[in-house]
Design a protein with these regions (language model features):
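Domain-level signal for soluble alpha/beta catalytic cores
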Residues: 1-172
Length: 172
């Protein structure tokens, strides 16, 4: 949910709530029923056949994939002020595309370039913040991949990796 929220993957029914950003985040995770708002939480699914679950991000046809907010960098700066060396971790573009539910007529292919641009911006902001390492988790790589899946992965990371200057990427 953190990475989806960072990329503005917020369904319209949650955007319509007259609540703070934090309350919107929790509404997506737990639902919201007060002050005239009534939305259920996003669906949950098992995380790669484990007993852990994740909240399924929903992408609507008019979803504008872009970096939204500064939580990732704010938390990094907070740790830095406490003299804690840390490395931000985000879900990778390939995995996030595979885990999202597309609710309209558009498919993952329609959003690939927007994801690439958003991840490039994340890396650029990490460079600007002096972040030495950004960990990008791609657990979907453990699944069987078709030739089309491999092409998608190569397309994403050949373009994303071009965005970095000094920030190193730990892809796992």
């Amino acid at each position: 949910l953190d990475t989806a929220f960072l990329l503005n993957i917020i369904p319209e029914r949650y955007k319509k709530l007259n609540v703070s950003s934090l309350d919107r985040y929790f509404a997506m995770a737990r639902g919201y029923q007060k002050d005239g708002g009534d939305v259920k939480a996003l669906a949950m699914k098992k995380w790669f056949n484990t007993n852990y679950h994740y909240i399924v991000p929903e992408i609507e046809d008019d979803t504008d994939i872009k970096v939204s907010g500064s939580k990732l960098w704010d938390e990094y700066k907070e740790a830095e002020k406490l003299n804690i060396k840390t490395k931000p971790v985000i879900t990778g573009a390939y995995t996030l595309l595979k885990l999202c539910r597309f609710t309209g007529k558009k498919t993952q292919e329609d959003f690939v370039d927007a994801f690439i641009n958003a991840y490039k911006e994340i890396i650029s902001r990490c460079d600007n913040a002096g972040i030495q390492w950004l960990q990008i988790d791609e657990p979907a790589l453990v699944l069987d991949m078709t030739d089309k899946d491999r092409e998608l992965f190569v397309k994403i990371y050949s373009k994303i990796s071009d965005a970095r200057r000094s920030c190193k990427l730990l892809l796992q």
